Amino acid sequence: MKVDYIFMVMKGRVIRLYPKDREKEFFNLCFRFNNRAWNICHANQIAYRQAQQNNLMPNYPNHGKSITNNKDNLDKKADSKIKNYVVKAYNQGWKKYYTEKNVNKPKFHSFRKSRKSYTTDKPIFEGNKLTLPKCQPIKFKGQLLNNEIANITIFMKNEKYYASIIYKNEITQKPFEIFFCYYYILFLC
């Protein structure tokens, strides 16, 4: 009886975006909200740890409510998925800090120095145009795959906008290949 194993592998592509002024304003708003959400998560974590040291027995910090309770309503103007991805990335940063060696603590993000990016999902591709939530269609240049999209990260580098698309890709391997790869890796280590 032959058994094949199926692995889910993530692959990525980067495409260049050509947004108009309105979309550029929207992207900058999303970058600002992403930065603010990260910094609020970090401030909540610091306050939680200080309260723990003073034996005040705090509850676990609720990042969600404090991120959305702001005066300028950035959360309503920006993409709604940003908050979820920021909290997830922040928690992963702390997990890496405690589990891996040579990883620094998560810190506050400066808007000028940090990489201006945000992550979302459910993009729609129609021809050579990309449609994101709460955004008009944007022209892009690059090749796409026909696989399922896991998420998309919009980032700005040198005043140019790019999208990093992460695809889900299935790979089928036979047991002998897995056995051989496992022992080859052990041999190299």
Where are these regions (language model features)?
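Nucleic-acid substrate recognition interfaces
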Residues: 1-189
